[in-house]
Structures are given as structure tokens and as C-alpha cells.
């Protein structure tokens, strides 16, 4: 026999998996059920797991699978969401991006535009970005604005809480400045390129990951150069 909160959480997870194929984050579950802390979500998930309703998928950050539903589930009562909408927050990349990424101008008179495909984003570990200048991808013009753009591929599952799945392609608009909270491609120390959320803290810049298993990294402003911002995502089925 499940408690009402357990049933509500189980149905919430089930609906999110059915709609998007991605488990909700602990923060999303906490807010959906109107709880004040994530410790309550941990207890509910443990109870559901012990009763055989869900299981945690190994080697995947907070990935859950619904094994069964109660015969007479309680109606789902989800608290209204008040937090900032979840933005795309892809993972870490590396490569020689010190030279300007040329990108390509978007064309308003076509249904799709071909963009250079500059590399893959590894799950949890930085890797050398692929710089094959012959690689490209056709992108619907509705995903891009004016200016130069390029694409990066995603590999792995460490960004599933942000809706970024293995095999996704992220679309980046070249820029040298960005507003606080924007997901950017940042060049650190003219050596490492990373795709993170930008947080300015005084004279420092924090590069914020999506996965709580990874630490936010803080640098002096002179060590970080913005190479572009995230504007879209493509997923193949």
C-alpha cells in the first residue's frame, strides 16, 4: 500500500518519462509535490524502490525506471511551478577553439541551413573536440537567429536532468558577451572549452554544471572568453 505522496511521486515520474523519456530532477520532484526539501523525495523514492514500483538505473545520474503502477492510482496533484524554467545545460567539451569559429550565416530564404559540426560533448569527462571542417549538419532555420552559428554533438547521459540526451546536437550562436544565467561555450585559459551556465560573481566568472555530482568552477574574468551561447537542440529518433 502506497501513501498518497508516494503515489503522486510515482505518477509524476511516470508522466515525465512518458512525455519526454527523461526522469525529473530531484528539485522538480520536490517542487511538483510541494515539499520543502529533497530529503523527503529521497525517502519517497526509497520507499517506492523497496516496494518494487521503481528502480534506479546503474551508472546513470538519478535515472529512474517505473516498473509498475498501483491498481487504483491517486489523482496527481502537482504544486504550481514557480522556479525559473529549466534551460538547456549541456556538459563539458574540450578542443582547440582558440581560433575564431567561423560559423555560417543563417539564411532567411531557406527552410534549413547547413552549419559546421565542430565536435562531441562527452558525458562527464572532457575530450578533444573533433575539428573536421568537412562535417556539417542541416538545421531548420526556425532554430537559429541572425549571426554565425555552429553545432556540437552530445555523448552520454550526464545531462539527462536538463533534457539533454545522448546523440543530441546543440546549436550555438557565436557571441563574445552573454547575460548572467545564459548557457555558453566558454574558453578557459586558452586551452579548455566547456559548455556551462554563466554566473558572474563580482570580478569572477562561475561556470555552473547541470549535474550536482560536478562542482561549479570559478575563474577570474580574464581567464574566460565566451565563444557562443546555446540557442537550440536537435534530437534524432
Curated annotation (Swiss-Prot):
Catalysed reactions listed for this entry: Hydrolysis of Ala-|-Gly bond in repressor LexA
One family name in Pfam for this protein: Peptidase_S24
Alphabetical keyword list: Autocatalytic cleavage, DNA damage, DNA repair, DNA replication, DNA-binding, Hydrolase, Repressor, SOS response, Transcription, Transcription regulation
Domain of life: Bacteria
An individual GO BP term: negative regulation of DNA-templated transcription
Broad class of enzyme this protein falls into: hydrolase
Protein name in the entry: LexA repressor
Organism: Rhodospirillum centenum (strain ATCC 51521 / SW)
Gene encoding the protein: lexA
Amino acid at each position: 500500500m502506497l501513501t498518497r505522496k508516494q503515489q503522486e511521486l510515482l505518477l509524476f515520474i511516470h508522466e515525465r518519462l512518458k512525455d519526454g523519456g527523461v526522469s525529473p530532477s530531484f528539485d522538480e520532484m520536490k517542487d511538483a509535490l510541494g515539499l520543502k526539501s529533497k530529503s523527503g523525495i529521497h525517502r519517497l523514492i526509497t520507499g517506492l524502490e523497496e516496494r518494487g514500483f521503481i528502480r534506479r538505473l546503474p551508472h546513470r545520474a538519478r535515472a529512474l525506471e517505473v516498473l509498475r503502477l498501483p491498481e487504483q492510482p491517486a489523482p496527481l496533484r502537482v504544486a504550481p511551478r514557480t522556479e525559473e524554467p529549466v534551460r538547456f545545460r549541456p556538459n563539458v567539451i574540450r578542443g582547440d577553439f582558440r581560433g575564431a569559429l567561423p560559423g555560417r550565416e543563417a539564411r532567411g530564404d531557406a527552410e534549413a541551413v547547413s552549419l559546421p559540426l565542430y565536435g562531441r560533448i562527452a558525458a562527464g569527462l572532457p575530450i578533444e573536440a573533433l575539428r573536421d571542417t568537412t562535417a556539417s549538419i542541416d538545421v531548420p532555420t526556425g532554430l537559429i537567429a541572425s549571426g554565425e552559428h555552429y553545432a556540437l554533438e552530445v555523448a552520454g547521459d550526464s545531462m539527462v536532468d536538463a533534457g539533454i540526451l545522448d546523440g543530441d546536437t546543440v546549436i550555438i550562436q557565436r557571441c563574445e558577451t552573454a547575460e548572467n544565467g545564459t548557457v555558453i561555450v566558454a574558453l578557459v585559459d586558452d586551452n579548455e572549452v566547456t559548455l556551462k551556465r554563466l554566473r558572474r560573481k563580482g570580478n569572477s566568472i562561475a561556470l555552473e554544471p547541470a549535474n550536482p555530482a560536478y562542482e561549479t568552477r570559478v575563474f577570474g574574468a580574464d581567464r574566460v572568453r565566451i565563444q557562443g551561447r546555446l540557442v537550440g537542440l536537435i534530437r534524432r529518433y
